Amino acid sequence: MNLDGLIVGLGNPGKEYENTRHNLGFMLADALLDEVRRTAPHAVTSLGTGKKKYDLWKCAPLTGGSSWLVAKPLTFMNRSGDAVAHICGFYRIPPEKILVLHDELDLPLGRMKFKTAGGLAGHNGLKSIAERTGSKDFHRLRLGIGKPQSGQTTGYVLGRFGKDEQALVEKVLQAGVEGIRIFAQQGAVAATQFINAQDIQ
């Protein structure tokens, strides 16, 4: 299988975590798959859903015919690296060809940043991926969720977006899908320029 790389949306499995702030990476992965299916219905191929470690799809048209894998780990956030390491080992994908989609407390909702390698910003999903792949050299699309006013981080990230935030979340997902397309087609520099300029209101 000729692959350009792996796109990983981070989140926690199970209905109790659906549409929570910590699952914004899952939500963007779903939005990407939905958009590809909408424009090219036969371009998304399931490579196994409901597996022990991950759901996985092949997305053909992101770069005009070549293929990317899209994954959602089912191992819970703190063990996301188990799924990523398994996929990368099986399909021989190096860390520099991985793009991780994840929530980011240090950015407000409506802002996003593209980053390659470097620190992990205390994100347990990123820590797990770095530990299990043995590298920090993967790309990240950091999706702002803002910080809680009270400082109770766990309850905040596991809470759902409010009704007044839903329209903004949809705009973020649309911009995120476009950012992923730019990354797949033009590379990290172009993706950084587009994504880091986003200030969605």
UniProtKB/Swiss-Prot annotation:
Gene Ontology cellular-component terms listed: cytoplasm
Role, per record: Hydrolyzes ribosome-free peptidyl-tRNAs (with 1 or more amino acids incorporated), which drop off the ribosome during protein synthesis, or as a result of ribosome stalling. Catalyzes the release of premature peptidyl moieties from peptidyl-tRNA molecules trapped in stalled 50S ribosomal subunits, and thus maintains levels of free tRNAs and 50S ribosomes.
Record site feature (Stabilizes the basic form of H active site to accept a proton), residues: 103
GO molecular function: peptidyl-tRNA hydrolase activity; tRNA binding
Name this protein carries in UniProt: Peptidyl-tRNA hydrolase
Main localization category: cytoplasm
Keyword Cell division applies: no
Record PANTHER family: PEPTIDYL-TRNA HYDROLASE
Localization of this protein: Cytoplasm
Family named by the database record: Belongs to the PTH family.
Active site, UniProt feature: 22
Subunit structure as annotated in this protein's UniProt entry: Monomer.
Catalytic activity reported: an N-acyl-L-alpha-aminoacyl-tRNA + H2O = an N-acyl-L-amino acid + a tRNA + H(+)
Chain sites annotated for binding tRNA: 17, 76, 78, 124
Site-annotated residues for Discriminates between blocked and unblocked aminoacyl-tRNA: 12
EC number from the UniProt entry: 3.1.1.29
